Amino acid sequence: MRSSAIACTAGIALCIAAPASAEVVHSCAGDLAVETVATGLTNPWALAFLPDGRLLVTERPGRMRIVGSSAKVLDGKLSPALAGVPKVFASGQGGLHDVVLDRRYGENHTIYFCYAEPVDGGARTALARARLVDEPTPRLDDVKVIFRQDGPLSSGNHFGCRIAQTGDDNLFLTTGDHFSGRDQAQNLANHLGKLIRIRPDGSVPPDNPFVGRSGAKPEIWSYGHRNPQGLALNPATGKLWEHEHGPRGGDEINIIEKGKNYGWPVIGFGIDYNGARIHESTHKDGMEQPIWYWVPSIAPSGMAFAPESMIPAWRGNLFVGALAGQALVRLELDGEKVVKEERLLPQLRARIRDVRQGPDGALWFATDSPNGRILRVAPAK
C-alpha cells in the first residue's frame, strides 16, 4: 500500500515543565518533549541500550562509544572511542554501521556489529562479534569476523548492514546491492541485495532455504533487496520486518519470509535518478509485494516497534527514521497492515538515522550529521 501521511498541527515551543534542553512539539497524540541527550557525534549510525541504561553508539567514520556515566545516560557524557574496532571503509556510504547486543549479553558481554570492510578494489559488508569490556577503559576484545559478503565489491554505496537476532539465537543481516550491481540482487550465487541468516559463530543453520542448492549461497534467507537499512522483529507476531531504500521513489517495508524474492530490480515503484525506467512492472508472479511504500522517497533508516511506549496511543506502532524525509515516521498498524502514517518532528530538519525504544518506554533516535545528536522523545509534562 502506498504511503498516505496524515498531518497534525505542527509547532514548536519552549516548555518550562520539561527539562531545560527539551523542546515541545505537537503530534496527533499530544505534546511531545524532545530532549537532546548527547551531541558531538560524527554521523552516528546505530544505538544499542546496555543493561544499565547507558547507550552504545556507532559513528560512521569507525568509532564506537558509550554514552552516559555509570547508569546516568542522560548526562550525555561520551566515552573515548573503544579500542578494538577493526579498520573500516569510511568513504561514500561506508563505515561502521549497526550494533546489537547478544540476547545473553548479561552472561557473555557479546555484541555484534556490521561495517564496510576495506579490501583491494573496494569494500564489502562484514559482520563481526566481540566481547565488550567496560572497565577500566571500555574496549572490544576477542573480535572475530563471522560473515563477509561475497560478490562484486562496492565503490562506496549500498552496504545494507542492519542486524537482528531471533529467539533461537540466529542472526539476520541485511546486505545491499552495491548500487552498480543491482541485477545481482536476483543472483543466488552471491550475497548482494540479500537477507543473510547465520548462527552466532558464523556457521549456516541447516534449515536455511538454499542449503544444498547448487550454485546458491547457503547463508541467504531472502533476496531481491536493494539497500535495506531497517530490520526489526515484530513483538506481537515474532515476524521479521524490513525496510529498504528505493531509487527515486519506491522505498519499501516488507515482512520477510523464508526463501522469498522481494523483486528488486525486476519490480518496484520507483524510477532511476535520471528519470529512466528500471522495473518491468510493479507486480510479477513469484515476487513479493511490500506492505507499504513511499513515493516520493523518504530514505528510510532504522526501525523500531514500540510495544511499551510511554504514549498509550503509540503502543504497538512502528517507527522509521527518514533521512531525506527529515522526520520520524509513525506507522499505526492493524495486524500486518499499515492503516495510518504520521510524520513527526519535521521542525528539527534532521536526517534521522536510527530509532530505538528505550527501556524507559521513550523513543530515542540519532541524527546523521557531522555534529550528530542523540535525542529522546517522551510526553511533555
Place the predicted regions along the sequence by residue.
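Conserved blade-ending motifs and adjacent loop-strand segments that build the rim/top face
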Residues: 225, 338-359
